[in-house]
């Protein structure tokens, strides 16, 4: 009886919990429009806000006309220059300007008419550290807005040779090398929050335009001041090519471009990868490591691009299908801009959206009704590029960035009065000392609610990434209702601001995988690449049995262990690092020394038992710093000082880097990496105080 009574009570409790959850979901606010409706969210409270933002800059010149006259200046026709010189020839162009990594170059530019312009720069990267080129632009001695002080110019990377196949049938991707050629780029937001190129206001007459180096040298050819255009819509694009016809050859053509066959990319990290988990990648293999897609985690920063070459067999209209996968962030959208031969054909493909899915999806570029877009191509070689693009999410992230800036201003003002550890027994009278802060908190809360609604409208659901914004909005409302709560919750307020900043960075990551792109005639069969139950089942079963026969821990070429000219190397790090190591060994060490190397990827826990059993390797890499001496105590490793070239090798190392590997006069390991300290500073605080960063 008691047992039955207990079960009834338990069932009733569960029912109550379920009922509460259901009621909560039914009564939960679908949006927060009531919180901010009727309020002006664009006006800042006096003394709290960013006056130098790009949005404020556009508001300042909202009535300025769009200039209708485009013109160009030669970079070599400068007025003043430091760390720069004219080159007679570079990359087929003459009379160009080399600018060093500490350069500052000014041009006197006669502007034909007052208005807003885009600025386009033609440049040529030079061999250096391989990072992006960065410049700050000044107009008449001043940086026009925040963001113009940090303009990035990408490099071009390509495969250093062909894909190699080892003696077990596994493909080994080539390393990346920089390709030097002339390229062009508009001045734009390096963070990608502002999707379109920056607009600059210039008055008619003489103006001084200055480029100041922030990072890396670069060669400049010309600087173009362009007419701002809104872009061509698909209807206009189709009308402009209405007279073009399609031959039978073009109408039935199918050109398949594999993702891993990319011809160029903006970052060396955007290399080909392999996926054995899916049953429908192309190419496909269960046992061998076959490169079959590109993108992934490295392809997440707005502005990064990958480009492929292809050949159209005949003049005509073509459809484009992309097989991609965005399984990195639930409730998020990864956007890509489509370029054909360096141009976005029409506005509708400025942002091609890939929604969350666990599976590979084929996306045919089409309108809202599902009618495929038609692209007109002439016969011959073409280039197709996909560039990471935040799309509508960029405006939200830009707004959130300004939110964080203002919230930090509020926090610092309060901190001046309360200190880092406020006295909970003291009445600070914040509403009387800083009434503008309380007013700003009320306004910022409404702005955050608006951002949350905008984000949900784009993604279709409340992402966990925007949860911090909601927490802050609620917290700010409570602060406004009861200012005495602010000192007590100051620590959590600071943490929430930091959390929102982290969320912004996370939301700006737009990862995507690409298996292949199909450019096909309008009469060709539609691309279908879905995986059925039986195909998935066969893939899973085959993959399972392959584990009994394939050594997945071996990297690259594997040689006979009994060969006297073979050494065994074990690595404890990730597979990607191991593949790079094996590639370096096979490309340089083995050809020069005629010593073959087997590389094995193993678990760190297996090392000690293997060594004690006499089955250990000749060399171990990526071990913890304390391990060499631990093994030296057991006489399980060799003293490196016995080798005649030891002191020549360690001459390049600071002695402190291998001190921990010394034991009883011997040295039992060499460092692979060395840590060092760096100092970060708050740019916003330095700017607020009007201080320059000390160059000491």
Across the structure, where does each feature detected by a protein language model lie?
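Extracytoplasmic
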Residues: 3-518, 522
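Short, solvent-exposed loop/turn elements at domain surfaces
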Residues: 271, 576-580, 679
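Extracytoplasmic ectodomains of secretory-pathway proteins
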Residues: 499-556
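Helix-loop-helix "hinge/cap" segment bordering the ligand-binding cleft or interdomain interface
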Residues: 532, 598-602, 641-644, 662-696
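Immediate post-signal peptide segment of exported/extracytoplasmic ligand-binding proteins
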Residues: 549-568, 664-665
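Early extracytoplasmic/lumenal segment of secretory-pathway proteins
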Residues: 564-568, 572-629
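Pocket-flanking alpha-helical
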Residues: 604-638, 651-668
């Amino acid at each position: 009886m008691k047992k039955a009574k207990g079960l009834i009570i338990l069932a009733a409790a569960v029912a109550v919990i379920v009922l509460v959850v259901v009621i909560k979901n039914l009564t939960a606010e679908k949006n927060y429009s009531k919180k901010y409706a009727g309020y002006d969210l664009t006006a800042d409270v006096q003394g709290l806000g960013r006056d130098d933002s790009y949005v404020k800059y556009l508001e300042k010149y909202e009535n300025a006309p769009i200039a209708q006259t485009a013109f160009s200046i030669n970079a070599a026709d400068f007025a003043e220059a430091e760390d720069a010189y004219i080159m007679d020839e570079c990359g087929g162009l003459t009379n160009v300007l080399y600018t060093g990594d500490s350069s500052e170059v000014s041009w006197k530019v006669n502007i034909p008419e007052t208005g807003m312009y885009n600025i386009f720069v033609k440049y040529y990267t030079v061999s250096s550290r391989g990072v992006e080129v960065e410049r700050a632009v000044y107009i008449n001695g001043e940086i026009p807005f925040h963001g113009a002080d940090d303009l990035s110019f990408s490099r071009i990377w390509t495969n250093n040779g062909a894909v190699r196949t080892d003696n077990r049938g596994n493909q080994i991707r080539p390393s990346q090398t920089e390709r030097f050629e002339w390229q062009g780029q508009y001045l734009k937001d390096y963070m990608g929050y502002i999707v379109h190129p920056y607009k600059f206001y210039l008055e008619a007459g003489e103006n001084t335009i200055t480029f100041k180096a922030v990072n890396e040298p670069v060669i400049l050819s010309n600087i173009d001041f362009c007419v701002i255009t809104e872009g061509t819509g698909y209807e206009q694009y189709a009308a402009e090519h209405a007279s073009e016809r399609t031959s039978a050859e073009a109408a039935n053509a199918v050109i398949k471009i594999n993702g891993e066959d990319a011809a160029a990319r903006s970052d060396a990290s955007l290399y080909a990868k392999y996926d054995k988990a899916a049953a429908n990648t192309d190419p496909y293999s269960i046992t061998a490591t076959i490169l079959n897609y590109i993108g992934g985690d490295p392809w997440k920063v707005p502005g990064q691009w990958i480009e492929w070459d292809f050949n159209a067999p005949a003049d005509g209209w073509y459809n484009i299908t992309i097989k991609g996968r965005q399984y990195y962030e639930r409730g998020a959208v990864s956007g890509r801009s489509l370029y054909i031969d360096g141009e976005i054909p029409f506005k509708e493909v400025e942002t091609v959206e890939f929604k969350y899915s666990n599976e590979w999806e084929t996306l045919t570029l089409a309108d809202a009704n599902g009618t495929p877009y038609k692209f007109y191509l002439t016969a011959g070689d073409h280039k197709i590029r996909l560039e990471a693009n935040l799309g509508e999410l960029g405006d939200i992230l830009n707004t959130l960035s300004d939110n964080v800036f203002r919230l930090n201003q509020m926090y610092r003002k309060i901190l001046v009065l309360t200190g880092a550890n406020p006295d909970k027994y003291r009445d600070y009278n914040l509403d009387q000392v800083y009434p503008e802060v309380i007013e700003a908190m009320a306004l910022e809360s409404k702005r955050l609610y608006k951002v949350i609604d905008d984000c949900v409208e784009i993604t279709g659901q409340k992402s966990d990434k925007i949860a911090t914004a909601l927490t802050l909005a609620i917290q700010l409302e409570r602060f406004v209702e009861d200012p005495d709560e602010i000192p007590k919750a100051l620590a959590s307020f600071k943490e929430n601001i930091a959390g929102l900043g982290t969320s912004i960075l996370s939301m700006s990551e737009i990862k995507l995988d690409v298996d292949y792109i199909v450019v096909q005639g309008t009469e060709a069969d539609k691309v279908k690449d879905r995986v059925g139950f039986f195909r998935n089942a066969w893939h899973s079963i085959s993959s399972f049995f392959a584990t009994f026969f394939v050594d997945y821990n071996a990297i690259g070429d594997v040689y006979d262990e009994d060969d006297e000219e073979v050494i065994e190397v074990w690595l404890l790090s990730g597979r990607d690092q191991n593949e790079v190591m094996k590639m370096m060994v096979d490309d340089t060490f083995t050809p020069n020394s005629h010593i073959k190397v087997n590389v094995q990827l193993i678990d760190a826990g297996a090392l000690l038992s293997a060594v004690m059993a006499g089955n250990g390797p000749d060399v171990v890499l990526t071990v913890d710093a304390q391990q060499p001496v631990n093994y030296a105590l057991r006489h399980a490793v060799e003293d490196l000082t016995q080798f005649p070239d030891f002191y020549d090798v360690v001459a390049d190392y600071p002695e402190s880097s291998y001190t921990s590997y010394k034991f009883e006069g011997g040295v039992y390991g060499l460092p692979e990496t060395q840590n060092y300290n760096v100092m970060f500073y708050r740019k916003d605080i330095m700017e607020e105080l009007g201080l320059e960063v000390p160059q000491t």
